[in-house]
């Protein structure tokens, strides 16, 4: 079988990126089929029923392109492998990233296995803005060509074997080009806005949604000087560096600086705040990361120089990484960084290549 006749299953989300991905693969000569994944059981009425609309859009695109659309329900896998861990992290006072977990457990595990075993696919494809390239005989993950849309941060858990079985057609394009292709083709998704919110759970009100699964525990808001200035409705609703939603307007000592979350005392259910987004308590000189995933799957020992992102869309931070043991590293930044958040991911790069990453276990605060 020639390379161009190979079978690709495209994860069709009902969005513009996966729609255009399917068309691009058709142009490249692949045998293309679509798969719509239902990963959440809707139980709260019409207001949040986005899955049905997304499925209708995915079906309309597949009809237009003349390709078959399969559907699969991964709700049980999502609940067990993504959502329960997501809740446990919030309960522990950390701020997890469910999109990274979802890519790891659903899109590049459950989907990959289903496509290969049930649909006899040679590859899967998604609408992620990343690229792949072979380096030293292994498939590597590269940043997407569109630096504004690069999604390699969310895919750092992938192994070189998973990347070798995955295609990322829009990673070579910029977003406006993708929308233009969709418009020229007359696809219903051409002007559909990009999805935000929790992976697969959609745009629902986050605080209300989380409150259904984790009972909120109100507690004190205390300044770094120890003054009590308000009450929070639950530590889980707040993250380091947060400014909005604290409900403690006004100023102190005549300064006009707004209040920011600088720490959480989980044991005592206290939210600690300070004024100014560059307050020393918000700054870190480094971090400790665990649950490491290196794309080449080679164990990391010794030290290395590279860059790191501690959150999506952050400018790369030059740093030195040192192995502490098989599954923990210490990262020291060249310059202090604000709002390094336990539970989020630290993702490492060498130029365009995403090396891998890990979960931030603790931040190393600026010495006082």
From Swiss-Prot:
Q: Which GO terms describe its molecular function?
A: ATP binding; tRNA binding; tRNA-uridine 2-sulfurtransferase activity
Q: What does this protein do?
A: Catalyzes the 2-thiolation of uridine at the wobble position (U34) of tRNA(Lys), tRNA(Glu) and tRNA(Gln), leading to the formation of s(2)U34, the first step of tRNA-mnm(5)s(2)U34 synthesis. Sulfur is provided by IscS, via a sulfur-relay system. Binds ATP and its substrate tRNAs.
- Compartment list: Cytoplasm
* Quaternary structure and interacting proteins, as annotated: Interacts with TusE.
Give the gene name.
mnmA
Please name the catalytic residues of this protein. Answer: 102, 199
Which cysteines are disulphide-bonded?
102-199
Q: What is this protein called?
A: tRNA-specific 2-thiouridylase MnmA
Q: Which reaction does it catalyse?
A: S-sulfanyl-L-cysteinyl-[protein] + uridine(34) in tRNA + AH2 + ATP = 2-thiouridine(34) in tRNA + L-cysteinyl-[protein] + A + AMP + diphosphate + H(+)
Q: Site annotation (Interaction with tRNA): which residues? A: 128, 344
Reported EC number(s) for this entry are 2.8.1.13
Source domain of life: Bacteria
> Which GO annotations describe the biological process of this protein?
tRNA wobble position uridine thiolation
């Amino acid at each position: 079988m020639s390379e161009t006749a190979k079978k690709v299953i495209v994860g069709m989300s009902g969005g513009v990126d996966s729609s255009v991905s399917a068309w691009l693969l058709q142009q490249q000569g692949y045998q293309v089929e679509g798969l719509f994944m239902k990963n959440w059981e809707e139980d709260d009425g019409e207001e949040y029923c986005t899955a049905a609309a997304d499925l209708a859009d995915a079906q309309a695109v597949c009809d237009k392109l003349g390709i078959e659309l399969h559907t699969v329900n991964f709700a049980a896998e999502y609940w067990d492998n993504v959502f329960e861990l997501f809740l446990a992290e919030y309960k522990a006072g950390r701020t997890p990233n469910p999109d990274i977990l979802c890519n790891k457990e659903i899109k590049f595990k459950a989907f990959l296995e289903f496509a290969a075993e049930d649909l006899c696919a040679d590859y899967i494809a998604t609408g992620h803005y990343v690229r792949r390239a072979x380096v030293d005989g292994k498939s590597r993950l590269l940043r997407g060509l569109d630096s504004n849309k690069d999604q390699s941060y969310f895919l750092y858990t992938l192994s070189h074997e998973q990347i070798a079985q995955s295609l990322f057609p829009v990673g070579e394009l910029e977003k406006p080009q993708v929308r233009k292709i969709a418009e020229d083709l007359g696809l219903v998704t051409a002007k559909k806005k990009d999805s935000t919110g929790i992976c697969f759970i959609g745009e629902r009100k986050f605080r209300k949604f989380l409150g259904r699964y984790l009972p909120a525990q109100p507690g004190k808001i205390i300044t770094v000087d120890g003054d009590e200035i308000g009450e929070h409705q639950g530590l889980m609703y707040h993250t380091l560096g947060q400014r909005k939603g604290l409900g403690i307007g006004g100023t102190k000592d005549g300064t006009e600086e707004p209040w920011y979350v600088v720490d959480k005392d989980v044991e005592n259910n206290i939210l600690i705040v300070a004024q100014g987004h560059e307050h020393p308590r918000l700054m870190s000189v480094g971090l400790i990361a665990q649950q490491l995933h290196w794309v080449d799957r080679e164990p990391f020992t010794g030290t290395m120089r590279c860059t790191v992102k501690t959150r999506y869309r952050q400018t790369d931070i030059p740093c030195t990484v040192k192995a502490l043991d098989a599954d923990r590293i210490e990262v020291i930044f060249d310059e202090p960084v604000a709002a390094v958040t336990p539970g989020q991911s630290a993702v490492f790069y060498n130029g365009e290549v995403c090396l891998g990453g890990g979960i931030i276990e603790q931040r190393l605060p600026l010495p006082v």
